[in-house]
Amino acid sequence: MPSIPRKPAFAARIVLCGLVFAAFMSLSGFVVSALGLKMMALPDGANQQAVAMASLLASPLLPLALAPLAVLLPGTFLARSLWLALFAYVSFGLNTMIEARIFSTMVGPGALAGMSVFYVLPCCALALAVAAAFPARAARPAPLPGRTASGWVWRLLLAWLAFPVCYLFFGWAISSLVIEQYRRGVNGLALPPIGVIVATQLGRSLLYLASVLPLVILWGGPWRALAVRLGWAWWVLVGLYGLITAFWMPANLRLIHTLEIGADSFAYAFLLAWALRAPSKRAAAAAMPHAA
């Protein structure tokens, strides 16, 4: 994780942003119910009060994931809020629900639409709070690498395929430890056909790419810093927060998936940041005589 200032004021801002998120999560639940939309159903026996308390206690993780990105994202307050909200919504809300739709019985027919609406308010509120609490330290975006049109095409293709490749590799690495529980349908889990898994991850990757491109284009720091901060953010938004609160899942499954998602988040982030933000060889060669 990127270095974080050890100051009480920083901690207070993180906690406050987390409380804003938690408050709007509760409000969004009322809104979705009032609209008559379906919500995700927890497995039988799940302690909803324990889940709610864990969600509240874990809420500071979410601004802690976005703040390192926010401080190197130049632009107006509203623009920064918009791009952070889009990134958080796709990573934390939409793509997570798509994954839950195929790997569990909790997101039933109609619930995907309801949950997609549910996450709009809290993600927007979180982004506004983080953008306000953590102003940009970068005045302007770092220049994009100079590449030909064909160079950008294959790098965008690589950025699209990077997520499914990382996902499938690390999923395969831990499959022998978890697959039996999915086959047995433990606590609402399900195991879809491999064709469904691959097609879903290709679609999710397009959503990830669309949501992260504004951050990549506007990034005001070096590409390696982008990679580390994106990896940390995805780990929290996609896995860590949700698995901390998923008390209905077996503890060993939660731990294994936490490590798996952390590994593929950082691997994907480094591949994406390298593909889209690393300096071109031509630019590096041109800079060598000046350095000499």
Predicted regions, residues:
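Juxtamembrane/disordered regions of integral membrane proteins
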Residues: 2-292
